[in-house]
Amino acid sequence: MPLPFGLKLKRTRRYTVSSKSCLVARIQLLNNEFVEFTLSVESTGQESLEAVAQRLELREITYFSLWYYNKQNQRRWVDLEKPLKKQLDKHALEPTVYFGVVFYVPSVSQLQQEITRYQYYLQLKKDVLEGNLPCTLEQAIQLAGLAVQADFGDFDQYESQDFLQKFALLPVGWLQDEKLLEEAAQKVALLHQKYRGLTAPEAEMLYMQEVERMDGYGEESYPAKDSQGSDISIGACLDGIFVKHKNGRPPVVFRWHDIANMSHNKSFFALELANKEETIQFQTEDMETAKYVWRLCVARHKFYRLNQCNLQTQAATLNSVRRGSSSRMSLPKPQPYAMPPPPQLHYNGHYTEPFASSQDNVFVPNKNGFYCHSQTSLDRTQIDLSGRIRNGSVYSAHSTNSLNTPQPYLQPSPMSSNPSIPGSDVMRPDYIPSHRHSALIPPSYRPTPDYESVMKRLNRGMVHADRHSHSLRNLNIGSSYAYSRPDALVYSQPEIREHPHLASPQSAHYPFNLNYSFHSQAPYPYPVERRPVVGAVSVPELTNVQLQAQDYPAPNIMRTQVYRPPPPYPYPRPANSTPDLSRHLYISSSNPDLITRRVHHSVQTFQEDSLPVAHSLQEVSEPLTAARHAHLQKRNSIEIAGLTHGFEGLRLKEETMSASAADVAPRTFSAGSQSSVFSDKVKQEGTEEQGSGGYSHKKSLSDATMLIHSSEEDEDLEDDSSREHAVSEPRLTAAFSQEQQLNYPCASVTPVTGPLHIFEPKSHVTEPEKRAKDISPVHLVMETHQPRRHGLLTPSMSESDLTTSGRYRARRDSLKKRPVSDLLSGKKNTVEGLPPLGGMKKTRADAKKIGPLKLAALNGLSLSRLPLPDEGKEVSTRATNDERCKVLEQRLEQGTVFTEYERILKKRLVDGECSTARLPENAERNRFQDVLPYDDARVELVPTKENNTGYINASHIKVSVSGIEWDYIATQGPLQNTCQDFWQMVWEQGVAIIAMVTAEEEGGREKSFRYWPRLGSRHNTVTYGRFKITTRFRTDSGCYATTGLKMKHLLTGQERTVWHLQYTDWPEHGCPEDLKGFLSYLEEIQSVRRHTNSTSEPRSPNPPLLVHCSAGVGRTGVVILSEIMVACLEHNEVLDIPRVLELLRQQRMMLVQTLSQYTFVYRVLIQFLKSSRLI
């Protein structure tokens, strides 16, 4: 039919998808294969990287990224946070993207996943062959021999070594010399024979270890010019930023810890050095290059700093926190190079699982029908007689030596789990990888054949455990992670032999191989070799089928499958789960205090997006808690009886466990009027309820993840623990499930008879507090070898208990960039950088040295029963320094410091006294939404247009010792938007000394905005509102720095001198080791205070000392408490640390935030007494 107006349209039988709706990303892998992914045009580089990681079943994607060639034919790394298509359209020479290593590690033994090491090996080999990593001829031949062994296997598998002529042996720059190539091939052939017997992973490891010792390893450079105009190459390496001169001058390396800041301006890239107070500039080709170099160097700086602090605590952390999987394991020798996941990226975190992934699956019936529960049993490697391990590899008899090293716990994705991802050559059923020809079988990330091919081979009887053809290596689908990986909603459960009738004969004889499908609700009653095999291109849920018939035809499998959308690349999740606690301990699931204080290091990825998981977890735990199976054998669970074996004689006997919740409550009053103070009025009649004003602890599972860490000593006592636990479980139910709430006893306090006084808010003193002022202190002095039969271990308040009201995101969008608090948003630690468990419990030998109370406190437990009155020992005013020192040391050794600390209220009993701080307009002025000043103790500013309530997160703290008044202001580290308020407070309160107890940035996280100008910089003056700040001088004294500042009021012209004393030796985790250095810092504060008091105006003879850290409670409290207690020692006053701390916390909540900080105060006082004896 002709068209009107003579229009003619081209007729075709095809249509094209609009380029505006999708993007076909073509990515070249490190083995030179290409994969294509269909993505949205808005898909970021991160999503593309995750797609590659899914294809490779790679979890440790932190080290990898994507790059492309720009229009100047230069390599440029993709910005993972921006859409990939826009970057390629704007900058790329071609649409091809390349996968590679962006962050190099100091030691390749720290890479945990086998696929990670293999990809890392391919990257290093590519760097050598392409000439990016310079090497000598001897080094190239040595590496070539290892590469041939890794890629081709033993030399005796081939008739001759002629194939080496076609193999790329040497770097590309030497390929033109044929004579050199021939000689090199002969030497490589000899090396190939020498390396006979090495498996592919072993040869690859030797190759990588050889490369990491070469000059230029991990370097990436760019051309630039220095300040003299000389041509240089600048780039990042493992140690820092290097500068190589092309005129023969030796290279210069600016180490990461010496670099304070990096910036770029136009075409200039600048480094600010921390120790020299100077800035070094380099000129790049253009503005885009300067910005790119800055972005790359900043990323590497953060990566290596985070990993440096991780490596320092890795051994202790992995020995404690990672053992929260309610399992026993032996950690591998090399410690992983773990990086905490960046919070802004979903999956770009390296979540280290440094233990063997051997799993005995248990199928506990549940109501939802979707998720099974499995137990990880790590006291042995998961191997059956055919040499199959959990990652899907089949090892021959002479290659099982590699199984001695525990394999990392993987959560790989299937070969293609997205319907929009088309197949490629990798997905072909007849595809056989050509890069490995050794006895080592390719792991599960190698391509797998389809169902048809597998069944044909099965019918031909080709499956034998000792066969090694490439087609047979891929048959191990039943035990491969592509089909047995846990998704995000699979939780571990105890190893319960609840279905013995379902086990196969093989699993009956060899209980370490149950042949259970990870996702199916019923185990396969058949060996792995006889199971049906599902095609490779599928989602993981394709094996989540309940198969109980004798035969397993494929159509039945597909027909009964409930299809769901493919899950994203799995979140790194902690190995433990809360239902374990509900099952083993019969404790209410709302008691997160059973966790160790450093559990947040384990659950750093438990963020808001995983809250639905926790709610569904509560539902799962209900039928588990209700179950009563006395005959079940529970291995690797953390039992109450088994836990107390590690308490050095501190046991819970059956008569103790039968106590009800009422038995926990009241402490008795003695004749000496010594008493205890409860959080609220305790009901004496055994009731299960608390008063309305009670300081209770009730959180749902969406607030915290519960972990209990077993001790290694439990291994030898496993059977006894199980039997004792089976008897005591019903008794524990009555003791622990009372209204899901617990009373938390606070510290008893000393009489106010001495000259030590606290200015307390009159209107907020409760009855228990008034009674507390007329009683004597009770200090726990307990012999470690005597078992406590009448004390019931109860959960104690941990550092995670800031407030329950703090668990919410800020109301405004601008607050989303800043967490409510570090621990609440899922970051590494608590507000003050809570140290990992290893900071207190470093080795097994150290754990044996500590007493029962200390060990109990470290595990979040404390005795609710106070010792008898004669057990207490007061540090009297008449005691000599030697006697005081001895008493303090005795408290530390016997562990009474820990129970003493746990009894101190973290904040006032009555909540809601921070109304001004909780106003919506003041939310942006709080660094953390759960650390707020009380209304009657807060520092009030003169209201301004910008701050009409005159609010700042700061508190007055007033103490009187021997008639001398000590006045402090405790505040948080200034934010960028509160610097003006900070300096207004300094001016209005007449502050002359600022004591800063933190660095500006620790571990890549901002602790305090730099509110004063640098000395020696071009701009040594900064203006905040009406105040102009100028740096006059700076003196570095080792562990602290003294800076003189001039503060000028621009409206009146008045000037003042402000002293800035910054303690620079506080580690990111724990407390300072140099006690003398900290005491010298306190002496510097005293010295400057005396100087300022002597020169101050008469109207302000004693200006307050302003102390701040990050949140203004942890380290700030340590400084204030230490200085007050030192003053008590100097004036020979009663030394009552817990009472002083409790009264300090009545003026600002949660001062001295962690147990280690409280212990540090004791150590400071002991060191002060020892030093005073020498004077």
From Swiss-Prot:
Location of this chain's protein in the cell: Cytoplasm, Cytoskeleton
Gene Ontology terms, MF aspect: protein tyrosine phosphatase activity
Cellular compartments per GO CC: cytoplasm; cytoskeleton
Reaction equations catalysed: O-phospho-L-tyrosyl-[protein] + H2O = L-tyrosyl-[protein] + phosphate
Positions where Phosphoserine occurs in the chain: S577, S589, S590, S637, S673, S710, S711, S798, S800, S805
CDD domains xref list: FERM_B-lobe, FERM_C_PTPN14_PTPN21, FERM_F1_PTPN21
EC number, UniProt record: 3.1.3.48
Active-site residues, Swiss-Prot/TrEMBL: C1109
Tissue specificity as recorded in UniProt: Particularly abundantly in adrenal glands.
Annotated residues for binding of substrate: E1068, C1109, S1110, A1111, G1112, V1113, G1114, R1115, Q1153
This protein's UniProt keywords: Cytoplasm, Cytoskeleton, Hydrolase, Phosphoprotein, Protein phosphatase
Domain FERM, chain residue ranges per copy: 23-308
Region annotation Disordered: where it falls in the sequence: 395-445, 663-702
Highest taxon of source: Eukaryota
Biased composition (Polar residues): 395-421
Domain Tyrosine-protein phosphatase: 897-1168
InterPro entries tied to this protein: Band_41_domain, FERM/acyl-CoA-bd_prot_sf, FERM_2, FERM_central, FERM_CS, FERM_domain, FERM_N, FERM_PH-like_C
Transmembrane parts of this sequence: none
BP terms from Gene Ontology: cytoskeleton organization
Main location: cytoplasm
Family: Belongs to the protein-tyrosine phosphatase family. Non-receptor class subfamily.
PANTHER family recorded: TYROSINE-PROTEIN PHOSPHATASE, TYROSINE-PROTEIN PHOSPHATASE NON-RECEPTOR TYPE 21
Name by which UniProt lists this protein: Tyrosine-protein phosphatase non-receptor type 21
Gene (UniProt): Ptpn21
